[in-house]
UniProtKB/Swiss-Prot annotation:
Keywords: Ribonucleoprotein, Ribosomal protein. GO terms for cellular component: cytosolic large ribosomal subunit. HAMAP family: Ribosomal_bL32. GO terms for molecular function: structural constituent of ribosome. Residues 7-16 have a biased composition (Basic residues). This is Large ribosomal subunit protein bL32. Belongs to the bacterial ribosomal protein bL32 family.
Amino acid sequence: MAVQQNRKTRSRRGMRRSHDALTAAALSVDATSGETHLRHNVTAEGYYRGKKVINK
């Protein structure tokens, strides 16, 4: 098993972890159905940018 040769400082640890933060998902409301969905994704009803693209 690998063991580090020198201890990493709190600063180095923090700099490494600075990119680990989670961001909230970007949500949109569809103009036609008023449904909330992920950006650039089809709604559950099959609408994308106000047009029906999937028939259920």
